[in-house]
């Protein structure tokens, strides 16, 4: 139990000798120290037992594309294909022969109202009618029905060429042309005018110290300086007088629980306990928060049995993006970011140490007069003086003046030091400190989003030849060699007996063309092809007979009255009779015969136009007139409905010979031809050299046992006779039936992976790419070697308060020293040498996880780590301020192809193409003519042993050959499609079978339209916005006498997009004089 309370402190005794170490104290309260440094790594523990099998993992990424499988067997014959696509539009044919007049067509539908006709010629003058009485003008009658239309006129002659039409609208922008070759380097221009001031350069390195200047005038008094280093501890002060005993204070409130103390030192290792019995299996616990450490890899399992071959899977999804490429070179430093927001206020610093003593204050007012001192002690009695002579008693004199001050006494002992003065008032703010050294680089920023896939690079230079590959499979049989020279004739052999009829010869050469077959059935109507170009005008056909009148058309506009016809011949002039009185009007007589024309009267004034008369009844159709001159072409009527197919045309002229078709399948072997007559015996030839040993022949059939003859003497070997003339060719056999479908072959094994080729020489350095996106943060590198100590930096700002230190051991009580003045701070000692490395300590128990330490300084960049998995793309950061103009970028990607232009007129026929590369060896040719008949054997009794020739195998082989060729070189037809979609390929031309006439130019990078906040308007030096329109588009320097427009460092073409878009384009400087 604690003592009730200490008594008053006694006087300090003399220093005793140090006591023996005390026993360990009781466990202290939980301390507040910072977490200790991490202990050294313990020795590896024993291997844990293998863990339970983990849950089934998520499906892995899609594997790489497998090697192509072996080609399958030919399938069964497919159904009849669909009608093929329409053929390409043919060139315009020549003018056709003049056709015969067609049959009368059916009446057409009423045409559109014709344009107003020209005035017709005046008709002949009619007979003069009898004069009628002038009746009163009747009211205008109703409009009569339109009269029947006249007969259509014959077609007019072809009109002359019309004037050129107005320029059509501009077509859509064509695709961007290939970049032209670089122009020749122009001559060096004369030096330009001086440019504007450049940007401020980077801060230069520190110069060497200059000569010391003359001492300056004393500056104004500075503000309080930064906190100085802690001074050395002063000597211990004298003991003060014992104070009076204080009153016991009240109990304080209960303190808050302290922070958890640091991990205590590990206790000694206990003895190993006995192994307990195995407990029962507990219930499955909840899933742990952290994944456990990886178990040791288990032993390799036994190979499982091969699973049955699964059906072919569906086409896999497009694989995920590949791993990010290697880390790009460090980008050039980015521009400074915008200033950050003001940080939160830091914690209050510790109280500063006492400032230096303030300046001496003004002199205080005089103090009040002191109190009278105590009466001094009586001094000692002086010696008795010698007796003076007796003076006269004088009168009492006046008081004399005060004596002068005595001499200065010796200096008294120093007084006790006064109490420390109050802190002086705060001084003015000091001058701004010099700029600090450049800070350490900040942590690497978060990786930006993955950049768009770059274009495929230029192909590297060809690598050196790789090592020789393994021997390939045996190639197909070569073409037959040329015939050897004719051997000399051998000696004539004895004539053999006539041989049996030989087996059928191979099919003969193609016979002459047979008589034309009968007319085939009418084929299905093909799809209508695209309209061909207009053919040249045919010769004019004979006018057809007039068709029946069409239905009544709509009323045309009333034509203008025709011009007056030519005057008729003047009639004989009659005698002018006297004018009689007007008699009553008789009934109108019949029209007399036409009288001779009277003289032409003077032209009367034009009367008012009368009302339109009623239309008379339609007269009978007159006889068909001759076909009139062709009228002007009317406007094209609407496209009529599609007519029925016409009767088949006459047989056309034979077309030009077609290209040679692919070899047809071999026909069945024809019946054997009749044996040719035996050739005459040739003269006996000289003995030939022995030939090379031939390949072993097939085993012949077993011959019948002959009677054993006597062994005759071996005669000399006869030379072979000259070949007999070949027999006549057999007829061509019929086409064999397709063979039965073969069984499915067993799958071939996967081919072995070829050896990797040697690394090719490094390609030339590519053009500088665009600035790459910042790479992902690499792993923290190893600590670099210890650097040399740098120069002393300027004093930093006061640091944050440190953690509370550990409690020190109790020091021995020092002797009482007098209080010294604070000494100046000593110079910083040099760093001591590194101590020897201690031995490895015993592994401590695993401590609790410490508090998170401060972020260490950024280490040197480590070696490039392995590429991590691609992280998910972070959100796009805000757009930074516009950086300075970058270097001249490479030419942009090709723009999107423009819309299809109108179909151009067919171009002139191009020159013949270059000779293509030699094609692959063709399929084996047709069998040659049959060779001469060999010597016969008598095999008459063994027909039952002969195998019929397997024609089905031949047909199957031939079909396989054709299908393999179609697989290797697909024709692009529906049965053998050629694939055009290869998004992983790079942009370029993709010819078909090495023929570039129909190559497609495909851009394999597709535009991602977006918006860039980079609309910059440039002003010239005369404060004019540079938004002029320049029309010169030539490569080279252009002279100008307006240097205010130069140099053009940028231009922004306008109206190249929507209303909310503007397109910018950076140019390099324009050369100018």
UniProtKB/Swiss-Prot annotation:
Family statement: Belongs to the fibrillar collagen family.
What residue stretches are annotated with the Fibrillar collagen NC1 domain?
Answer: 1039-1073
Statement: the UniProt record of this protein carries the keyword Cytoplasm: no
What Pfam families is this protein classified in?
A: COLFI, Collagen
Q: Tell whether Secreted is among the UniProt keywords.
A: yes
Q: Which UniProt keywords apply?
A: Collagen, Extracellular matrix, Secreted
Tell me what organism the protein belongs to. Answer: Epinephelus aeneus (White grouper)
One MF term in the entry's GO annotations = extracellular matrix structural constituent
Residue stretches of biased makeup (Pro residues): 217-227, 918-932
Q: Please identify the protein, giving its name as recorded.
A: Collagen alpha-2(I) chain
The entry's cellular-component GO terms read: collagen trimer; extracellular matrix; extracellular space
Q: Where is the composition biased (Low complexity)?
A: 100-148, 178-187, 194-215, 229-239, 296-315, 321-348, 386-399, 411-423, 458-468, 561-575, 584-597, 617-642, 653-680, 708-729, 758-774, 821-836, 857-876, 906-917
The residue ranges flagged as biased composition, category Gly residues, are: 246-255, 424-433, 481-508, 607-616, 745-757, 811-820
Q: Where in the cell is it found?
A: Secreted, Extracellular space, Extracellular matrix
Give the residue ranges for region: Disordered: 1-939
Q: Which InterPro entries does the entry link to?
A: Collagen, Collagen_superfamily, Fib_collagen_C
Q: State where composition is biased (Basic and acidic residues).
A: 519-530, 837-851
């Amino acid at each position: 139990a604690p003592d009730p309370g200490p008594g008053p402190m006694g006087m300090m005794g003399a220093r005793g000798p140090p006591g023996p170490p005390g026993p360990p104290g009781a466990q202290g309260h939980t301390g507040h120290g910072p977490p200790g440094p991490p202990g050294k790594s313990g020795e590896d523990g024993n291997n844990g037992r293998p863990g339970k099998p983990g849950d089934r993992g998520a499906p892995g990424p899609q594997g790489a594309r497998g090697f192509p499988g072996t080609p399958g067997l030919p399938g069964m014959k497919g159904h009849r294909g669909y009608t093929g696509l329409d053929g390409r539009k043919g060139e315009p044919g020549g003018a056709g022969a003049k056709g015969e007049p067609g049959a009368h067509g059916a009446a057409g539908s009423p045409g559109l109202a014709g344009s107003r006709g020209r005035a017709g010629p005046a008709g002949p003058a009619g007979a003069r009618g009898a004069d009628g009485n002038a009746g009163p003008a009747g009211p205008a009658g109703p409009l009569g029905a339109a009269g029947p239309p006249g007969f259509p006129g014959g077609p007019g002659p072809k009109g002359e060429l019309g004037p050129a039409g107005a320029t059509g609208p501009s077509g859509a922008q064509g695709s961007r042309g290939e970049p032209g070759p670089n122009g020749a380097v122009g001559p060096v221009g004369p030096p330009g005018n001086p440019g504007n001031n450049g940007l401020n350069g980077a801060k230069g390195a520190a110069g060497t110290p200059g000569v010391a200047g003359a001492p300056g005038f004393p500056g104004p008094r500075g503000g309080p300086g930064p906190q100085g280093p802690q001074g050395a501890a002063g000597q211990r002060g004298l003991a003060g007088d014992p104070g009076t005993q204080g009153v016991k204070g009240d109990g304080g409130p209960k303190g808050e629980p302290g922070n958890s103390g640091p991990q205590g030192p590990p206790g000694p290792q206990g003895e190993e306990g006995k192994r307990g019995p195995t407990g029962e299996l507990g219930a499955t616990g909840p899933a742990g928060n952290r994944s456990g450490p990886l178990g040791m890899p288990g032993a390799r399992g036994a190979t499982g049995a091969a699973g049955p071959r699964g059906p072919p899977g569906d086409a896999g999804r497009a694989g995920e993006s590949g791993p990010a490429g290697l880390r790009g070179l460090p980008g050039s430093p980015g521009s400074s970011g915008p200033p950050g927001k003001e940080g939160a206020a830091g914690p209050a610093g510790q109280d500063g140490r006492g400032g230096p003593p303030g300046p001496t204050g003004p002199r205080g007012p005089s103090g009040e007069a002191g109190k009278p001192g105590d009466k001094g002690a009586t001094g000692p009695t002086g010696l008795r003086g010698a007796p003076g002579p007796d003076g006269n008693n004088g009168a009492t004199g006046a008081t004399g003046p005060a004596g002068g001050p005595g001499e200065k006494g010796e200096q008294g002992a120093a007084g006790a030091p006064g109490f420390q003065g109050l802190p002086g008032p705060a001084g003015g703010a000091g001058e701004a400190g010099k700029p600090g050294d450049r800070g350490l680089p900040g942590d690497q920023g978060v990786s930006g989003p993955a950049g768009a896939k770059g274009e495929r690079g230029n192909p590297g230079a060809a690598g050196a030849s790789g090592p020789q590959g393994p021997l390939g499979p045996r190639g197909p049989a070569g073409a037959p060699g040329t015939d050897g020279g004719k051997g000399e004739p051998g000696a004539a052999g004895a004539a053999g007996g006539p041989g049996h009829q030989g087996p059928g010869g191979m099919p003969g050469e193609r016979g002459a063309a047979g008589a034309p077959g009968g007319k085939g059935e009418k084929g299905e109507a093909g799809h209508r092809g695209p309209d061909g170009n207009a053919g040249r005008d045919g010769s004019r056909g004979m006018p057809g007979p007039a068709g029946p009148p069409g239905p009544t058309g709509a009323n045309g506009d009333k034509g203008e009255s025709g011009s007056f016809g030519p005057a008729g011949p003047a009639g004989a002039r009659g005698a002018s009779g006297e004018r009689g009185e007007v008699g009553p009007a008789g009934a109108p007589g019949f029209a007399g015969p036409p009288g001779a024309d009277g003289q032409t009267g003077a032209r009367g004034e034009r009367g008012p136009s009368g009302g339109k008369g009623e239309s008379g009844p339609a007269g009978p159709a007159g006889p068909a007139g001759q076909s009139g001159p062709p009228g002007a072409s009317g406007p094209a009527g609407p496209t009529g409905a599609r007519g029925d197919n016409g009767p088949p045309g006459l047989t056309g002229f034979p077309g030009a010979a077609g290209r040679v078709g692919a070899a047809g399948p071999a026909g069945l072997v024809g019946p054997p031809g009749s044996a040719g007559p035996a050739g005459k015996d040739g003269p006996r030839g000289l003995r030939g050299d022995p030939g090379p040993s031939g390949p072993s022949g097939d085993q012949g059939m077993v011959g019948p046992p002959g009677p054993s003859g006597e062994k005759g003497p071996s005669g000399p070997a006869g030379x072979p006779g000259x070949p007999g003339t070949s027999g006549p060719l057999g007829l061509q056999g019929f086409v064999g039936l397709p063979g039965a479908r073969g069984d499915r072959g067993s799958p071939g094994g996967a081919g072995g992976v070829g050896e990797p080729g040697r690394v090719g020489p490094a390609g030339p350095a590519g053009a500088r790419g665009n600035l790459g996106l910042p790479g992902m943060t690499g792993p923290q590198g190893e600590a670099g070697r210890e650097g040399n100590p740098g120069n002393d930096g300027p004093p930093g700002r006061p640091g944050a308060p440190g953690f509370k230190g550990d409690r020190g051991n109790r020091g021995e009580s020092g002797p009482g020293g007098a209080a010294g003045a604070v000494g100046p701070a000593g110079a910083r000692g040099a760093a001591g040498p590194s101590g020897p490395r201690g031995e490895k300590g015993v592994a401590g128990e695993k401590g609790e996880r410490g508090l998170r330490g401060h972020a260490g300084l950024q280490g040197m960049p480590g070696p490039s780590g392995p590429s991590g998995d691609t992280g998910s793309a972070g959100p796009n950061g805000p757009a930074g301020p516009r950086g300075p103009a970058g270097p001249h970028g490479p030419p942009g990607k090709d723009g999107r192809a423009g819309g299809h232009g109108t179909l151009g007129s067919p171009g002139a026929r191009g020159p013949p193409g270059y000779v293509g590369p030699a094609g692959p060896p063709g399929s084996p040719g047709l069998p040659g003519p049959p060779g001469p008949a060999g010597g016969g054997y008598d095999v008459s009794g063994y027909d039952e042993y002969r195998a019929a020739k397997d024609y089905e195998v031949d047909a199957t082989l031939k079909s396989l050959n054709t299908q393999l060729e179609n697989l290797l070189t697909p024709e692009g037809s529906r049965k053998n499609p050629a694939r055009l979609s290869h998004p992983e390929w790079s942009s370029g031309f993709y010819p078909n079978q090495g023929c570039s006439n129909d190559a497609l130019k495909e851009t394999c990078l597709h535009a991602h339209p977006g918006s860039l906040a980079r609309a910059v308007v440039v002003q010239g030096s005369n404060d004019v916005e540079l938004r002029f329109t320049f029309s010169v588009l030539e490569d080279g320097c252009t002279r100008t006498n307006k240097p205010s427009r130069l140099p053009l460092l940028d231009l922004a073409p306008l109206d190249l997009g929507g209303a909310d878009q503007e397109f910018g384009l950076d140019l390099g400087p324009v050369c100018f004089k």
